């Protein structure tokens, strides 16, 4: 099965994604990350109001295979957490780019926030080399 990477998302080399709408960014992990992790069993996310900084881990995701740090594609303040995914992290695999989102963040600089992210095409090229 070929994995899909929506064109309206931007990606990090560490397999997180961001969808920016105005100054609110929705963060999650890519279908490739879900595929590589396997069965997800635990998710640790920051609390509402916590500040995220590009390059600094904001949480962890644990599967039967591995524990991975999560990195934000943008800097900002957490304004929403997907409690359903915290309670049942295995559901992330059902729709990682949609209902399986992890956080919503109010972005510090929306105009330049996506400068260090990859387009879907660039990301597809990257993961093709990893699989």
Curated annotation (Swiss-Prot):
The keyword Transmembrane does not apply. CDD domains: GCS_H (cd06848). Residues 24-106 form the Lipoyl-binding domain. It holds the Pfam family GCV_H. Keywords: Lipoyl. Binds 1 lipoyl cofactor covalently. Signal peptide: none annotated. The modification N6-lipoyllysine is found at residue 65. Its cofactor is (R)-lipoate. The keyword Signal does not apply. One of its GO terms (cellular component) is glycine cleavage complex. InterPro entries: 2-oxoA_DH_lipoyl-BS (IPR003016), Biotin_lipoyl (IPR000089), GCV_H (IPR002930), GCV_H/Fam206 (IPR033753), GCV_H_sub (IPR017453), Single_hybrid_motif (IPR011053). GO terms for biological process: glycine decarboxylation via glycine cleavage system. NCBIfam families: gcvH, PRK01202.1. The glycine cleavage system is composed of four proteins: P, T, L and H. This is Glycine cleavage system H protein. It comes from Microcystis aeruginosa (strain NIES-843 / IAM M-2473). The lineage of its organism: Bacteria, Bacillati, Cyanobacteriota, Cyanophyceae, Oscillatoriophycideae.
């Amino acid at each position: 099965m070929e994995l899909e990477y929506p064109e309206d998302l931007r990606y990090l080399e560490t397999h997180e994604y961001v969808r920016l709408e105005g100054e609110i960014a929705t963060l999650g992990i890519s279908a490739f990350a879900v595929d590589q992790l396997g069965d997800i069993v635990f998710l640790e996310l920051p609390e509402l109001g916590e500040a995220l900084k590009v390059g600094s881990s904001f949480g962890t995701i644990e599967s039967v295979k591995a524990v991975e740090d999560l990195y934000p594609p943008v800097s900002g303040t957490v304004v929403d957490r997907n409690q359903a995914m915290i309670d049942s992290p295995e559901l992330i695999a059902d729709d990682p780019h949609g209902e399986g989102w992890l956080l919503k963040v109010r972005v510090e600089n929306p105009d330049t926030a996506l400068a260090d992210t990859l387009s879907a095409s660039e990301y597809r090229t990257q993961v093709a080399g990893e699989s």
